[in-house]
């Protein structure tokens, strides 16, 4: 009997672990790689990932490992769940082993130095690989707890999309397909910025009207920026756009929301990130997004306002007051506008 070909999941964080568990529950053999041998050993011994996904029992079909080469050698389908700041350095040394494989990025971030999305970095490292992006309203703890969830696999490669759907689709996890890889990935990266602002608003006791305004204007702002870069605006009306934005801006389980909430409680940015204990991609994305928006002359007042709060000494209340003074323009459109 032929042994089942394993699927590799790169990353020992909360989402990588939830994804590995889901794959294993669907009958897949999973090699989950993490840089820290001690973490891999602890997960093998305890059957849990107490640092990033406490209280969730791991399926025995998961094989934690710190040997990246061995994990890649056996797998054809590879899910990449690494922080944006670490992805290039982690994978560049094993570029030859990535050639021809199906590489699916789950990281919702932007590389600060280059403003490249993770799938673009994967293409640079492994030009012959088949690239996809997995994104949507997918809080790791809820995926692990089998809450009803849907996601999007985006790629121009239809065979890759089908392979991912077959591997992940199950009783509580539904996988839709999209050909707009750029739009799906950009939506996942951009929404993290607005989740920080929503968390701050919640901590400061702002009303539901205010929260709703922030989310809907964030969607308009994200779409405006994405269209400027060539994305399909309709993508932002789906799971990877408004769906991901809503859950990230509304749930205390969201890492970026948690950072924003801590800031609203009076913690410094360093203290808020330290309390989280994990990477909050929105902080890094905010810095490069503001600069890129100015370079492209895209009107993004919420991004500029949050940057003023985090890095220029303004308060959220001051920024919102300035935004409310601005001249209102159109509500819903898919072309650049000059109004908040």
From Swiss-Prot:
SUPFAM superfamilies for this protein:
6-phosphogluconate dehydrogenase C-terminal domain-like (SSF48179), NAD(P)-binding Rossmann-fold domains (SSF51735)
- Which enzyme type, at the first EC level? oxidoreductase
The residues annotated as the active site are: 191 (proton acceptor)
Cellular component terms (Gene Ontology): cytosol
**Reaction catalysed by this enzyme:** sn-glycerol 3-phosphate + NAD(+) = dihydroxyacetone phosphate + NADH + H(+); sn-glycerol 3-phosphate + NADP(+) = dihydroxyacetone phosphate + NADPH + H(+)
Look up the record and name the pathway of this protein: Membrane lipid metabolism; glycerophospholipid metabolism
Which keywords fit this entry according to its UniProt record? Cytoplasm, Lipid biosynthesis, Lipid metabolism, NAD, NADP, Nucleotide-binding, Oxidoreductase, Phospholipid biosynthesis, Phospholipid metabolism
Molecular function per GO: glycerol-3-phosphate dehydrogenase [NAD(P)+] activity; NAD binding
Q: Where in the cell is it found?
A: Cytoplasm
In this chain, NADPH is annotated as bound at 14-15, 35, 108, 140, 255, 279, 281
InterPro entries per UniProt? 6-PGluconate_DH-like_C_sf (IPR008927), 6PGD_dom2 (IPR013328), G3P_DH_NAD-dep (IPR006168), G3P_DH_NAD-dep_C (IPR006109), G3P_DH_NAD-dep_N (IPR011128), NAD(P)-bd_dom_sf (IPR036291)
Matching PROSITE patterns = NAD_G3PDH
EC no. given is 1.1.1.94
Query: For sn-glycerol 3-phosphate, which residues are the binding ones?
Result: 108, 136, 191, 244, 254-256
**Classification via Pfam families:** NAD_Gly3P_dh_C, NAD_Gly3P_dh_N
One BP term from GO: glycerol-3-phosphate catabolic process
- Which HAMAP family would you find in this protein's record? NAD_Glyc3P_dehydrog (MF_00394)
Q: What family does the Swiss-Prot or TrEMBL record give for this protein?
A: Belongs to the NAD-dependent glycerol-3-phosphate dehydrogenase family.
Q: What does the record give as the function of this protein?
A: Catalyzes the reduction of the glycolytic intermediate dihydroxyacetone phosphate (DHAP) to sn-glycerol 3-phosphate (G3P), the key precursor for phospholipid synthesis.
Q: What is this protein called?
A: Glycerol-3-phosphate dehydrogenase [NAD(P)+]
Q: Which organism is it from?
A: Ectopseudomonas mendocina (strain ymp) (Pseudomonas mendocina)
Gene transcribed to yield this protein: gpsA
């Amino acid at each position: 009997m032929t042994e089942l070909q394993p699927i590799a999941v790169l990353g020992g964080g909360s989402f990588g672990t939830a994804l590995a568990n889901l794959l294993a529950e669907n009958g897949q053999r999973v090699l989950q790689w993490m840089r820290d041998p001690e973490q891999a050993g602890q997960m093998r011994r305890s059957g849990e990932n107490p640092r990033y996904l406490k209280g969730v029992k791991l399926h025995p079909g998961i094989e934690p490992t710190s040997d990246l080469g061995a994990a890649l050698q056996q797998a054809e389908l590879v899910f990449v769940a690494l922080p944006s700041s670490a992805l290039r350095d982690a994978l560049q040394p094993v570029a030859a082993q990535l050639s021809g494989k199906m590489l699916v990025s789950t990281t919702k971030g932007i590389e600060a130095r280059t403003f490249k999305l993770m799938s673009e970095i994967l293409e640079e490292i492994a030009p012959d690989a088949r690239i996809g992006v997995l994104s949507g309203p997918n809080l790791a703890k809820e995926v692990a707890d089998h809450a009803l969830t849907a996601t999007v696999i985006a790629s121009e490669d239809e065979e890759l999309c089908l392979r991912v759907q077959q591997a992940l689709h199950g009783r509580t996890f539904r996988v839709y397909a999209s050909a707009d890889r750029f739009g799906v990935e950009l939506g996942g990266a951009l929404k993290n910025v607005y989740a920080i602002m929503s968390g701050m608003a919640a901590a400061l006791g702002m009303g539901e009207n205010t929260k709703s305004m922030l989310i809907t204007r964030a969607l308009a702002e994200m779409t405006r920026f994405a269209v400027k870069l060539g994305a399909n605006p309709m993508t932002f009306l789906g799971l990877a756009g408004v769906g991901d934005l809503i859950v990230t801006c509304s749930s205390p389980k969201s890492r970026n929301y948690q950072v924003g909430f801590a800031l609203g409680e009076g913690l410094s940015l360093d203290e808020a990130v330290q309390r989280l204990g994990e990477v909050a991609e929105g902080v890094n994305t905010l810095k490069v997004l503001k600069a890129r928006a100015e370079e492209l002359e895209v009107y993004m007042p919420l991004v500029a306002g949050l940057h003023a709060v985090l890095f220029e000494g303004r308060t959220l209340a001051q920024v919102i007051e300035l935004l409310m003074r601005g001249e209102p323009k159109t509500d819903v459109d898919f072309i650049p506008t000059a109004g908040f």
